[in-house]
């Protein structure tokens, strides 16, 4: 309980402090995204241990938290390094772990007897297609010179969205369905952040850097809150 309260306090202070520093024009505001991602990772480990590692949800949160901690490292490296393979390598690894965690969760649910009807699949695929079409239109319209490195990152984020939408359909109507819907929103945030990183790289417009780190902060905050809800 004490750890959860501490994480709550750190996340809230980091979010508020980051916004205040941004308003003051202090570049240190970007570190808020890294701190919140760290809180997300630590909260995920705590929830995994609470749920027990021999349960499906426990294993899911453990793998998810590892991805969160690597995502935190990717944000930090992105602020202190300009070496592409270091930055993208960590971002790719974090996204890959996110993909694996959700995939294992989905497969585990299927093994436990949960099923998706043809209608559920159609709904998930239609939502995914609509969101992907909108996202890629904005991505390639604003970032006409999309590099392979950035394109891969965006596609990985979109694939996570497809997985999450499928799990949302499984849990729809339950309290976990609400949380997975919030998780889908957080995946949209990370995708927006990834796209904004590309826009900033090619345009150097400060607005895109702001959107990038704010989007990643929202991702970390939403997922951190979900991981702090123990049940």
Label each PLM-derived region with a short phrase:
Residues 1-231:
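Polytopic alpha-helical membrane-helix bundles and their juxtamembrane interface segments
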